[in-house]
Amino acid sequence: MALRFPRFSQGLAQDPTTRRIWFGIATAHDFESHDDITEERLYQNIFASHFGQLAIIFLWTSGNLFHVAWQGNFESWVQDPLHVRPIAHAIWDPHFGQPAVEAFTRGGALGPVNIAYSGVYQWWYTIGLRTNEDLYTGALFLLFLSAISLIAGWLHLQPKWKPSVSWFKNAESRLNHHLSGLFGVSSLAWTGHLVHVAIPASRGEYVRWNNLLDVLPHPQGLGPLFTGQWNLYAQNPDSSSHLFGTSQGAGTAILTLLGGFHPQTQSLWLTDMAHHHLAIAFIFLVAGHMYRTNFGIGHSMKDLLDAHIPPGGRLGRGHKGLYDTINNSLHFQLGLALASLGVITSLVAQHMYSLPAYAFIAQDFTTQAALYTHHQYIAGFIMTGAFAHGAIFFIRDYSPEQNEDNVLARMLDHKEAIISHLSWASLFLGFHTLGLYVHNDVMLAFGTPEKQILIEPIFAQWIQSAHGKTSYGFDVLLSSTNGPAFNAGRSIWLPGWLNAVNETSNSLFLTIGPGDFLVHHAIALGLHTTTLILVKGALDARGSKLMPDKKDFGYSFPCDGPGRGGTCDISAWDAFYLAVFWMLNTIGWVTFYWHWKHITLWQGNVSQFNESSTYLMGWLRDYLWLNSSQLINGYNPFGMNSLSVWAWMFLFGHLVWATGFMFLISWRGYWQELIETLAWAHERTPLANLIRWRDKPVALSIVQARLVGLAHFSVGYIFTYAAFLIASTSGKFG
């Protein structure tokens, strides 16, 4: 018999039903569950696949550069970044005739194009690229890296080049390599690029390979470095009248601590960023020399963790046993990596708009909105993934004997207290926040807006004041004009910071009031509830009072049959599934808040947000309905416009989202009956019955249907909001 899909599971390959296909797809990447897998092959497969992942990333980024160089308008955008719309790529086949062609021919293009809202133009401009040739060179270089990655992946699957398990478990060498080799050296290299290429470009000097060795990035060269006069590199920075990309108002400093923003580009000073990357490089290069490898000096991770036993005895045996637990569990390591990456991605979202690093990106409002929303959604998915793999760790890899009375075991011992506290916090936040919103809503409805309960966020305002915001009138720390910190800040460090905090043209420490107080607590409710579901899923993954033997059923089981009541919907997978809905819900509130606050800021009518955000109808009417009006315009006698594609995507997103409920609310029996009826009809229909199938069609399992429903719900939700966000922002600001 020929080998059938899936080859990695003979049990599944022999399944006579369509379950074979779905279960095969579902377990294709669960290497641990494959036939004849060994620990060594598991590690080697994952290692090789990382190179494939890198190849895809390099190919994708190469494609961005290539298409902009080929079909974009980078060179004309560089001449006038604030008024030329950046083109992502051409549209080959604009449907709906001449009106469509006219609607999408923009940005000085000859034919229909897509506008770029990703910020790549601003990024490339900031780092010193100026011509299409530069973009092509970058695309070719990334294509080369992609090919190298593919070759490396293939190579590490060959017998002679397969690393051993001991190599993968050498934690100290990996730490040193990642800290020094990846973070340290790459940060140092980036500092080099900024100093040698980007900063000269911002001052009108074009540095390329042909003159790299001739142009001194600083008039005194390396002299100050070797003589210890490092402060010379900070002297004579660009002036506040500097025109970016020209020598007008330019200085000679390369490593500064100016603080605040370049007045023209509204982005951080390039010389500050070079300084930042140099500091990061130094820290990581040192960190990457701290762990004991071949030379018998430095820290041993195992010794470090075993020594972490709090003397008071409150944490039992502390971190004893954790080294082997983490080092032998890929799921634990992945959980830690995802948790870190999730936090970082959300921090990127928060910092990209408040401290914009790229020239002129702060004035490209649609790009700002798109990047914030994009990074928050990515962060949400990564964070839920961290808990999912944490739960799989508890089911597949956790050993009670190895972790006796350490912090991990004590987490499990105290899980009732942890879960009930999260539950209490969620209930408190939910009822109080909803109570305030509903009360205010009713007061507005009955025509007595003065009876709203409006709470001023005084603690948050105090924190903003401590960082230098003076408008609230708190005389504290950096907002205290006669304090030592304030005076030092004027001269010694970051003199531009206090100006930036108190300017109204940027997004640093936006002025906040009762509407912010309420939505902050709504978001806190979402975060705590999502966390509650995820933490409960992981801590109850091995078992609970209701189902003590849960770990024997694996990560995702629907129920333990009809004989055990209450065992449905309590697998660790179900917790992940439910948490994703809450995660999407929470990020919805986060992005609504960010977008509405910024639209009113950019339009100069902040009072709209301040007055309408304190009650539910305000959010529904003045944010959602008002901003979606262009998208629900429908057919009109004026034909197409450049927002039509977003209007279509808005509709289509709703369709995909609603389709999710078909999978989420109806279950197997209904579909099984329908499938059997359709199969009967198929077999009796001329021509159609020439096509036969070997697998008996069966309905999706409960868990699979949930996954398909969740996927449609998520994709539709994000499509809908993306269309709304981009259309409502670009429709207002062009």
Curated annotation (Swiss-Prot):
Task: Write out the residues that bind chlorophyll a B1.
Answer: 654
| UniProt entry keywords in alphabetical sequence | 4Fe-4S, Chlorophyll, Chloroplast, Chromophore, Electron transport, Iron, Iron-sulfur, Magnesium, Membrane, Metal-binding, Oxidoreductase, Photosynthesis, Photosystem I, Plastid, Thylakoid, Transmembrane, Transmembrane helix, Transport
Pfam families linked to this entry: PsaA_PsaB
Positions binding [4Fe-4S] cluster in this chain are 559, 568
Binding-site positions, chlorophyll a B3: 662, 670
Its domain of life reads Eukaryota
Q: Which residues bind phylloquinone?
A: 671
What is this entry's stated membrane topology? Answer: Multi-pass membrane protein
Indicate the family of this protein: Belongs to the PsaA/PsaB family.
| Physiological role | PsaA and PsaB bind P700, the primary electron donor of photosystem I (PSI), as well as the electron acceptors A0, A1 and FX. PSI is a plastocyanin-ferredoxin oxidoreductase, converting photonic excitation into a charge separation, which transfers an electron from the donor P700 chlorophyll pair to the spectroscopically characterized acceptors A0, A1, FX, FA and FB in turn. Oxidized P700 is reduced on the lumenal side of the thylakoid membrane by plastocyanin.
| Name assigned to this protein | Photosystem I P700 chlorophyll a apoprotein A2
Tell me which species this is from.
Daucus carota
